[in-house]
């Protein structure tokens, strides 16, 4: 994947400046509301809101992985090999769920960034999440 200087700047500076865990919790909660069948992977959770403990804890894991992708934009796939295997072989998460969560992250970024979330910015973040979804899906057969 080729990243332009504008794309690299947008992703790295925005990621540094935002409350990633809050963003992640809101994106997960949105996914659970809009796509309720995705809750099936979280049988241990009792609540599916952005302020619930379980959602916040999973958001930390998700945003931690997204942070790894931000710092390794030139080689996201190799960074996600183990995570992809875990989700494919142990957790049996449907690849489509990653795409749904990515959409929810983009929506939450738009809400957070408001006027700074121009169409070009949205396109950058959709590209980033597309790369991440591709990377976490690579071990699926």
Swiss-Prot record:
Keywords: Heme, Iron, Metal-binding, Oxygen transport, Transport. Heme b binds at residues 58, 87. The keyword Transcription does not apply. One of its GO terms (biological process) is hydrogen peroxide catabolic process. Coiled coil: none annotated. Gene3D superfamilies: Globins. Belongs to the globin family. Heterotetramer of two alpha chains and two beta chains. PANTHER family: HEMOGLOBIN FAMILY MEMBER (PTHR11442), HEMOGLOBIN SUBUNIT EPSILON (PTHR11442:SF7). This is Hemoglobin subunit beta. It comes from Heterodontus portusjacksoni (Port Jackson shark). The lineage of its organism: Eukaryota, Metazoa, Chordata, Craniata, Vertebrata.
